[in-house]
């Protein structure tokens, strides 16, 4: 009779991270998947990271997860998004070679101790005394375990839609998990339906690249992993094109044939990744929409047209593609499609991602209502860790909102639930000044060491990095200038008699360690990576105290009542999305408003300020 400590169901991004985390803790772990050869497949866009998402990848890496290292091994166009903005909202991103990414993930898993890969389909759970104690497989029968992690992605009762054609599938070419979906309903788990979509795939050699503008990779690629010294893969460029009036007219003329608009799909799709037909219907006044043509690999003929997700019939897809500059003669290798799938209301989970009604069952990824590789992987790591700790009779791990974006996401899911696919944005975090992508290891690697999921190699690397940073910080805090000395060096400060350290000067706008080294030569010995960390830390030091005060003030304002007469439309700065949700929910207090899906700390501050101003004006008139 087969048995393991932990069973992971599903081999997508959540499942791979869950399996690795569980095994790193020391639990005997089985990863169950339809096809071992498909482990680590990038089912949709060939990219990792981005705004908010890049923070999650850095946090996964700080916890010794796989995604950051795999992305570095496969990255073929690294770009740091929001480079001109502050470090807190910069988002590392890379296009990845699909094959290289998959190979990297599979290599990590096959080399992982305590991990067994099993090729089969789970058709039911074993439940004893209201606790999950294993699974039943389609071919191999019963496997017992101390905990099970479900990471079914879009496979749970998944259906693909292309025009009026519909069939059961987890993704193109792979079967759906239908029996397991039916069994979950029998356990009185609240399920819903969501949908996502993907564009057609095009042949690279049939695109007229010479007519299109190009987007270059960064000259100096910034890796995801704190262990990566250098990006080895050659960096490529992608091209940019646009839809036009002719494209839009073809889509409008055939909108009734779209699965999304014909009534065939009941699940809501991701708001921030709309289909092209959604864009035309909702933003009809636009004369065009930007499309990024992203090659899927160095030696792959496939191109991903980012921005053209659709569920229109294949003949319509071919027609509108021919109207787009550079794509007039493009060959469609695979049509775009929508996929609809079951998800579990995440409000049924604890913050360890365990289902409250079925102890021993953990959920991670799209089954919890999220969208995106990075969101799935982050949940997978946490669920796998907690499943292993449960079996080892250790306390469950909660990650707070003040510690990591992972904590923000899990808290949002569990406390607010979802009505549409959830994706991460930096605006969701109250503590984003301290939750930067550059300091993810400082925040999380010591915790991961306590939890037992960090390798000796990573821990040694982290300690050496911190020692260099501590030494550099100490040097900077012990080099001083008086106001007169500062002026003599061209530094403009108040003549208040206060001596300022090199660390203090780094908080000044446009100040760099390189400039300070002109009159403090000992600073030249600090390596470039430590310089970058120190400069960012010093820049934010002044603001972190204020952030803490703002948070304390916000907590006091939670009990502030929202008048029923409040004109939400009059509050400038609120998105139309939030205005409509607030009007629909009609929250009675700020605490109620906090629970609205998509509500951000910045939006709450706008509402509070508006209410307080209205009260002051009313008091003056009285």
Swiss-Prot record:
By sequence similarity, the record places it as follows: Belongs to the MnmG family.
Identify a single GO molecular function assigned to this protein.
Answer: flavin adenine dinucleotide binding
InterPro entries given in the database record: FAD/NAD-bd_sf, GIDA_C_N, MnmG, MnmG-rel, MnmG-rel_CS, MnmG_C, MnmG_C_subdom, MnmG_C_subdom_sf
Cofactor(s) needed: FAD
Tell me where it resides: Cytoplasm
Cross-referenced Pfam families: GIDA, GIDA_C_1st, SAM_GIDA_C
Q: Which gene encodes it?
A: mnmG
User: What does the protein in this record do?
Assistant: NAD-binding protein involved in the addition of a carboxymethylaminomethyl (cmnm) group at the wobble position (U34) of certain tRNAs, forming tRNA-cmnm(5)s(2)U34.
> What residues bind FAD, as annotated?
10-15, 122, 177, 366
Where on the tree of life does the source sit, at the highest rank?
A: Bacteria
What positions does the entry give for NAD(+) binding? 269-283
Record's SUPFAM superfamilies? Answer: FAD/NAD(P)-binding domain
- Subunit and partners: Homodimer. Heterotetramer of two MnmE and two MnmG subunits.
Q: What is this protein called?
A: tRNA uridine 5-carboxymethylaminomethyl modification enzyme MnmG
GO cellular component terms given for this protein: cytosol
Q: What is its main location?
A: cytoplasm
GO BP term, example: tRNA methylation
Ordered alphabetically, the record's keywords are: Cytoplasm, FAD, Flavoprotein, NAD, tRNA processing
Q: Which organism is it from?
A: Bartonella tribocorum (strain CIP 105476 / IBS 506)
- Is Mitochondrion there in the keyword field? no
Keyword DNA repair in the entry? The reply is no
Classification via PANTHER family: GLUCOSE INHIBITED DIVISION PROTEIN A, PROTEIN MTO1 HOMOLOG, MITOCHONDRIAL
């Amino acid at each position: 009779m087969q048995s393991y400590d932990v069973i992971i169901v599903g081999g997508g991004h959540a499942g791979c991270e869950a399996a690795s985390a569980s095994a790193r803790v020391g639990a005997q772990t089985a990863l169950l998947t339809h096809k071992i050869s498909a482990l680590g497949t990038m089912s949709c866009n060939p990219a990792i990271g981005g705004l908010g998402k890049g923070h999650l990848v850095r946090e996964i890496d700080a916890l010794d997860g796989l995604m950051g290292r795999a992305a570095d091994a496969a990255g073929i166009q690294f770009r740091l998004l929001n480079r001109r903005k502050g470090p807190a909202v910069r988002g590392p991103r890379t296009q990845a070679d699909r094959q290289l990414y998959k190979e990297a993930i599979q290599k990590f898993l096959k080399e992982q101790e305590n991990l067994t890969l099993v090729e089969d389909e789970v058709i039911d759970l074993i439940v004893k005394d209201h606790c999950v104690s294993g699974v039943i497989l389609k071919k191999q029968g019963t496997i017992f375990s101390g905990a099970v992690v479900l990471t079914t992605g879009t496979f749970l009762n998944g259906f693909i839609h292309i025009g009026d054609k519909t069939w059961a599938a987890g993704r193109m070419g792979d079967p759906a998990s239908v029996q397991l979906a039916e069994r979950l309903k029998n356990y009185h788990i609240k399920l819903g339906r969501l949908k996502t979509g993907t564009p057609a795939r095009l042949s690279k050699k049939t695109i007229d690249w010479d007519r299109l503008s190009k987007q270059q990779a960064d000259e100096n690629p910034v890796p995801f992993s704190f262990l990566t010294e250098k990006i080895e893969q050659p960096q490529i460029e992608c091209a940019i094109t646009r839809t036009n009036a002719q494209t839009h007219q073809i889509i409008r003329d055939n909108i009734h044939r779209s699965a999304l608009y014909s009534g065939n799909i009941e699940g809501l799709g991701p708001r921030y990744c709309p289909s092209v037909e959604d864009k035309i219907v909702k933003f009809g006044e636009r004369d065009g929409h930007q499309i990024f043509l992203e090659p899927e690999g160095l030696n792959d003929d496939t191109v991903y047209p980012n921005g053209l997700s659709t569920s229109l019939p294949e003949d319509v897809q071919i027609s509108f593609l021919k109207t787009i500059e550079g794509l007039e003669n493009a060959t469609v290798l695979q049509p775009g499609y929508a996929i609809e799938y079951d998800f579990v209301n995440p409000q049924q989970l604890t913050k360890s991602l365990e289902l409250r009604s079925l102890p021993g069952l953990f959920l991670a990824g799209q089954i919890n209502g999220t969208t995106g590789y990075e969101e799935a992987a982050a949940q997978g790591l946490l669920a796998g860790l907690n499943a292993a700790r449960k079996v080892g009779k250790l306390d469950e791990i909660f990650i707070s909102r003040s510690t990591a974006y992972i904590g923000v996401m899990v808290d949002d899911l569990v406390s607010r639930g979802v009505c549409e696919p959830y994706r991460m944005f930096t605006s969701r975090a109250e503590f984003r000044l301290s939750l930067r992508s550059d300091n993810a290891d400082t925040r999380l690697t010591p915790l991961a060491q306590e939890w037992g999921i960090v390798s000796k190699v990573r821990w040694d690397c982290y300690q050496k990095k911190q020692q260099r940073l501590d030494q550099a910080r100490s040097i900077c805090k012990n080099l001083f200038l008086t106001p007169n000395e500062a002026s003599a060096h061209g530094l403009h400060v108040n003549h208040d008699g206060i001596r300022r350290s090199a660390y203090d000067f780094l908080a000044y706008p446009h100040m760099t360690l390189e400039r300070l080294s002109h009159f403090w030569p000992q600073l030249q010995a600090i390596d470039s990576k430590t310089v970058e960390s120190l400069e960012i830390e010093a820049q934010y030091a002044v603001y972190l105290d204020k952030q803490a005060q703002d948070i304390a003030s916000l907590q006091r304002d939670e009990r502030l009542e929202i008048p029923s007469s409040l004109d939400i439309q009059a509050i400038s700065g609120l998105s139309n999305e939030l205005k409509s949700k607030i009007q629909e929910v009609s929250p009675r207090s700020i605490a109620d408003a906090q629970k609205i899906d998509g509500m951000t700390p910045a939006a709450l501050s706008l509402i509070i300020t508006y209410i307080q101003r209205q009260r002051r004006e009313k008091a003056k008139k009285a």
